[in-house]
Design a protein with these regions (language model features):
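Hydrophobic residues within alpha-helical transmembrane segments
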Residues: 17-21, 172-179
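Short extracytoplasmic/periplasmic juxtamembrane "stem" segments immediately C-terminal to an N-terminal membrane anchor
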Residues: 43-59
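Extracytoplasmic
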Residues: 102-174
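N-terminal signal-anchor/signal peptide hydrophobic helix marking the start
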Residues: 4-23
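N-terminal membrane-insertion alpha helix
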Residues: 14, 23-48
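Cytosolic-side ends of inner-membrane transmembrane helices, especially those
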Residues: 27-38, 176, 180-197
Length: 197
């Protein structure tokens, strides 16, 4: 009887260890996949705004005091909203900067200065710290218009959207896996006891 009890304990502990390892690895992988998918969706949104800005910059015969549109996003108009765009002309003695109203009197950091390399699509993507210590997700692209100038165009959005979504997913994923783990452990106990009976 003691030998059976000892064997049952070892089988249970072994099954528990494997279960914890498998659920942990699966949880990490799923969380990473979801975070990457959330970032890609957010980046597509930023890239849409970026392309719109670049089209505005490249439009010929514009008056120098032309105001850029809000890109269809009211948050670009609200001061320190977490959504910003910035266009820097870099081929002049003193860089000329245009920015969204939301940026107020602040400036966005440059991904180029943080050592982030251009992707195959010719853009830089990364996280930066914005005004009021905001966590921002930013896309940036250098634009060379020849005689019309060289520009660095950047768009940034509030990264808390990404963090909140992934945190919520991780919370529900953890709860689901905890419930699944309990069910599997109870099943293991039943199978071990039944098999050794």
């Amino acid at each position: 009887m003691m030998r059976q009890s000892s064997l049952a304990t070892r089988l249970f502990l072994s099954a528990t260890a494997w279960l914890v390892v498998i659920l942990a690895i699966t949880g990490i992988v799923l969380s990473s996949v979801y975070r990457n998918a959330t970032e890609r969706a957010f980046d597509r949104r930023l890239n849409l705004y970026l392309r719109t800005l670049i089209a505005e910059v490249a439009t010929p015969d514009d008056p120098p005091d032309r105001q850029f549109q809000s890109l269809g996003e009211p948050l670009f108009e609200l001061p320190l909203s977490g959504w910003y765009w910035q266009i820097t002309r870099s081929d002049t003695e003193k860089p000329e900067v245009r920015a969204s109203r939301s940026l107020w009197d602040k400036k966005l950091p440059k991904l180029e200065e943080q050592g982030i390399e251009l992707t195959a699509a010719g853009i830089r993507i990364g996280y930066v710290e914005g005004p009021e210590n905001q966590d921002l997700r930013m896309v940036e692209r250098p634009v060379d218009l020849g005689a019309d100038g060289k520009f660095l165009v950047g768009v940034a959005g509030d990264a808390s959207e990404i963090f909140d979504e992934t945190r919520s997913f991780d919370y529900y994923l953890g709860g689901t896996f905890a419930a699944l783990g309990i069910v599997l452990l109870l099943t293991t106990v039943f199978q071990v006891n039944y098999g050794l009976a």
